[in-house]
Amino acid sequence: MKKLLPDLIAILAFVLLSFAYFFPADIENRILFQHDTAAGAGAGQEVKEYYEQTGERSRWTNSLFGGMPMYQIAPSYDSTKSLQWVQKAYQLFLPDYVCLTFMLMLGFYILLRVFGIPVWLAGLGGIMWAFSSYFFILISAGHIWKFITLAYVPPTIAGIAVSYT
């Protein structure tokens, strides 16, 4: 346990820093308008109504581009429900914006620790990675899928590196 203490302190610092950054928004229950998220909800409305009427999930919508598969807009498969719990655990069940920033810091921290970087430098690297401007541009635009994909790149590389060592 004593060996893990510095890593646990770094993770706790990531949580506190994420909460501190979004503190005004969390306290006042503000919601950031994200155009692509709103547009995606509108695009999926037809399929949502179909599900409410029939109880069946449609895999196609006519509301975009004369027809489009739903897996690109709002995928919902029974097989992914078990993975949602794993994702929430990785996010420490934190609120939306807080968990996004936390995921970036934690993922890059894991990568740097796998490569043998000391805790304090890995923590600093995670913070620098997370607070680069592009990620906040993605959040404000509503490009959450792209954001989450980029958040999972560093721990994925770390997993690959660990599997070959």
What kind of region is each of these model predictions?
Residues 164-165:
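Conserved small/polar residues in nucleotide/adenosyl-binding loops
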Residues 5-13, 120-124, 149:
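Alpha-helical transmembrane segments of integral membrane proteins
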